[in-house]
């Protein structure tokens, strides 16, 4: 990755910080209840669905760390605002300490999170205000809200971003020099105030290095999520998509 590529990622990261801040501010003015509670309510349900969908991979030692990384650091039901604030605070220092690959990983993760925030915000608005769902979130209610929100291209892009992030991590770990450079940044990153970001990158690299090749893992994510996405779009009953992966009829969706 060239210096120019690094600057492109840094510029994109600055844009994403503003986007994330805007979404958080807008959310606080839209919902009657505290937005974090509403969003965590939805995200917790989604995390449970993902844990079930990828339970077969989690059961395999080769893929378990990568599944945990995606469930906790990418799709986790937790507030990422502190991480976003840390990026904003130390942004001027990042280019001097973090490698190009680390910045690329953070940028893709932030892009994915910003898009997920916007989609989740829309889901919460539909569920809470239009559908008046107040108690337990059911697969049927989720499916209906998903269809009402629409944003088909964004949903597909969300899946693609997950796979792009995985591909970046997978490309770095076989290179001992790049992998070592990322690990050597651990001390300086913590001293300069963005250790949480560095730890995020390291967790991803360690998980993907353990996997020894991510094609099967990333293909499974793309095929399963695209299959579920199209099932939801087409109005299928939840029984046809909210199922364990071994019972899922996976469509023919090739990862780009």
Predicted regions located by residue number:
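Extended, well-ordered protein cores
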Residues: 2-256
């Amino acid at each position: 990755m060239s210096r120019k590529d690094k600057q492109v990622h840094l510029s994109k990261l600055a844009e994403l910080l503003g986007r994330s801040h805007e979404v958080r501010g807008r959310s606080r003015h839209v919902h009657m209840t505290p937005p974090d509670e509403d969003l965590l309510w939805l995200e917790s349900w989604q995390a449970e669905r993902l844990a079930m969908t990828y339970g077969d991979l989690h059961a395999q030692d080769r893929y378990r760390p990568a599944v945990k990384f995606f469930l906790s650091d990418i799709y986790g039901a937790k507030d990422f605002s502190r991480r976003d604030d840390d990026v904003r605070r130390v942004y001027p220092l990042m280019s001097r300490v973090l490698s190009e690959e680390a910045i690329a990983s953070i940028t893709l993760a932030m892009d994915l999170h910003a898009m997920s925030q916007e989609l989740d915000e829309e889901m919460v608005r539909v569920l809470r205000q239009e559908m008046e769902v107040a108690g337990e979130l059911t697969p049927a209610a989720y499916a209906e809200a998903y269809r009402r929100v629409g944003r088909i291209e964004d949903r597909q892009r969300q899946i693609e971003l997950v796979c792009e992030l995985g591909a970046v991590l997978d490309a770095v770990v076989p290179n001992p020099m790049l992998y070592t450079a990322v690990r050597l940044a651990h001390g300086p990153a913590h001293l300069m105030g963005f250790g949480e970001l560095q730890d995020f990158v390291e967790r991803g690299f360690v998980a993907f290095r353990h996997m020894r090749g991510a094609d099967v893992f990333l293909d499974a994510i793309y095929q399963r999520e695209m299959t579920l996405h199209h099932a939801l779009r087409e109005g299928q009953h939840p029984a046809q998509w909210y199922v364990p992966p071994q019972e899922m009829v996976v469509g023919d969706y090739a990862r780009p």
